[in-house]
């Protein structure tokens, strides 16, 4: 293994990412430089494609703003990427959802997917909140 390969492997291990699948609704935070100020710009949309290539892995996120479809490609291991969080899982029968480009309005919606893992995590959270011994006083 070369020195470059070792550095790439360390960078990948350094940034753990959530399990993002095609069809998920995600929120991505990007660091934007405006003059000498920095701010985090959020972008929320549906993942329509995922390209896995180690450090060069990317996701393509699509959203509709004022009736116009906007797609943006994000490099997952970019130093400007602040966070990636998923909001909702959706069912996808394809690896690439490019057919959503031709759909408008309600036609572009995807059916929500309910995972047992997500449901058990939510149930554990609800149980801990309803437990009187864990309440704040």
Curated annotation (Swiss-Prot):
Gene3D superfamilies hit by this protein: 2.30.30.790
InterPro entries: Ribosomal_bL19, Ribosomal_bL19_CS, Ribosomal_bL19_sf, Translation_prot_SH3-like_sf
Ribosomal protein as UniProt keyword: yes
Highest taxon of the lineage: Eukaryota
GO terms under biological process: translation
Alphabetized UniProt keyword annotations: Chloroplast, Plastid, Ribonucleoprotein, Ribosomal protein
Keyword Chloroplast in annotation: yes
One GO cellular component term noted in the UniProt record for this chain: ribonucleoprotein complex
Any GO MF annotation of the entry: structural constituent of ribosome
Subcellular location: Plastid, Chloroplast
One Pfam family cited in the UniProt record for this chain: Ribosomal_L19
Record-stated family: Belongs to the bacterial ribosomal protein bL19 family.
Protein name: Large ribosomal subunit protein bL19c
Lineage of producing organism: Eukaryota, Viridiplantae, Chlorophyta, Nephroselmidophyceae, Nephroselmidales
